């Protein structure tokens, strides 16, 4: 477009800015449009060409379907692997927890048995001491009675 095709008309002038209107002159009939108004005519397709296009489309559909099925199979395989790993980790955790609990129970049992053995030993020592005191008392008592008379 040439600059003669455009007219600028000032509307307002303010401190905040300027308002104006652009007036475009109508196109001259001599100028050629830059793009065609209608799409180019398509050539008539033969039966063979139509058949080839249909076969190519069918091949693309089959290829796409095969790709989708492959992706689904890979996804299922991944899900199986994840599930198997989770089950294995759960089993390992259960096994470790059971071993830990068993070890703790054995330690408690040994501790309890050691405490019981210590109590029995103290009771035996006490009984032995009581028996010694009784013997000492019996051996002293007859002597004390004769001396008192």
Swiss-Prot record:
Function: Involved in the regulation of the microtubule (MT) filament system by destabilizing microtubules. Prevents assembly and promotes disassembly of microtubules. Its phosphorylation at Ser-16 may be required for axon formation during neurogenesis. Involved in the control of the learned and innate fear.
Biased composition (Basic and acidic residues): 104-143
PTM annotation (Phosphoserine): residues: 4, 16, 25, 31, 38, 63
Subcellular location: Cytoplasm, Cytoskeleton
Modified residues (N-acetylalanine): 2
PANTHER family: STATHMIN
Pfam families on file: Stathmin
All copies of domain SLD, residue ranges: 4-145
UniProt-recorded name of the protein: Stathmin
Transmembrane segments: none
One GO molecular-function entry: tubulin binding
Cellular component, GO annotation: cytoplasm; cytosol; membrane; microtubule; neuron projection
Organism: Rattus norvegicus (Rat)
Gene3D superfamilies per UniProt: 6.10.280.30
Gene name of this polypeptide: Stmn1
Sequence similarity: Belongs to the stathmin family.
